[in-house]
Design a protein with these regions (language model features):
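Transmembrane beta-strands of outer-membrane beta-barrel pores
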Residues: 50-54, 72, 83-87, 119-123, ...
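Repeated loop/turn-to-beta-strand initiation elements of outer-membrane beta-barrel proteins
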Residues: 42, 73-79, 110-113, 145-149, ...
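Residues on the lipid-exposed face of transmembrane beta-strands in outer-membrane beta-barrel proteins
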Residues: 46-50, 64-70, 101-105, 135-139, ...
Length: 253
């Protein structure tokens, strides 16, 4: 049994997905969607990670995500989605679904306009649904083969449907920074941070730190650490900070 538990731990670290808590709001768009540097009209990826443990404790965790971007001469359109759930002793302990869409229009080599919409369901953190719509201006600060950096901001609106009952609509300010560093031909570092704030009692900060290591031309190992902080969380899930660590196998379309 001890040997089996050690093997389970190794499998957990090498091929699984695990989390401290489900994220209440984890939509951070980190893909560099600049149409001026696109090498092909479509880029996409799908990734998944799974963990299962049996014995004295029975648990499972599944994480899956996809991201797709279509390019034109000065426009880019993106769709993304992710799902994660965790069960322990045949009881569901977290369940999160998130989908979103985005468009970008380049005004010139550095300036662009964007629009972005997302939907989140995370009942274990108090939300049957959370809908966010934002639009605004962005600046492509770096766009080289090694370093890519963009910053964007604009107004937004969010609709929250609480799992415990009730709903609320808020006007928000949105800001985000996304950075990519091509460390080697096969290794890429990604960092993204977004902020949604009502400039009062409700502010949400999302962060994603990732490392992607290519196995071959199609498959890669993707490691990610997500943090979500909300200074005014739902009453049914009072923790302000949620984290998620994942290890996934990614396939490039």
């Amino acid at each position: 049994m001890k040997a089996y538990n050690k093997l389970s731990a190794v499998l957990l670290l090498s091929a699984g997905a695990f989390c401290h808590q489900a994220l209440a709001d984890n939509a951070v768009f980190t893909s560099m969607d600049d149409p001026s540097t696109a090498k092909k009209p479509f880029e996409g990826s799908a990734a998944a990670g799974y963990l299962a443990q049996t014995g004295n404790t029975t648990s499972s965790s599944l994480t899956a995500q996809t991201n797709m971007t279509w390019y034109q001469s000065s426009m880019a359109y993106s769709l993304w989605g992710n799902a994660a759930n965790t069960s322990s002793n045949d009881e569901r302990s977290s369940e999160t679904y998130n989908i979103g869409g985005r468009s970008r229009y380049n005004l010139n080599s550095y300036d662009y306009l964007f629009g972005q919409a997302s939907w989140l369901s995370d009942r274990f953190n108090g939300y049957d649904s959370r809908d966010v719509l934002t639009a605004g201006y962005g600046r492509q600060i770096l766009n080289g083969p090694v370093h890519s950096l963009r910053a964007e901001f604009g107004p937004g609106v969010r609709y929250d449907d609480y799992h415990a009952g009730g709903h609320q609509t808020k006007a928000l300010g949105y800001g985000a920074v996304s950075y990519q560093w091509q460390l080697t031909d096969t290794t890429k570092f990604v960092q993204g941070v977004s902020v949604l704030s009502s400039f009062g009692e409700d502010t949400t900060v999302n962060s994603e730190t990732g490392l992607q290591v290519a196995i071959n031309s199609h498959f890669a190992l993707k490691l990610a650490y997500n943090v979500s902080w909300n200074n005014h969380p739902a009453e049914s899930a009072p923790e302000r900070t949620d984290t998620k660590t994942s290890v996934m196998l990614s396939y490039a379309m």
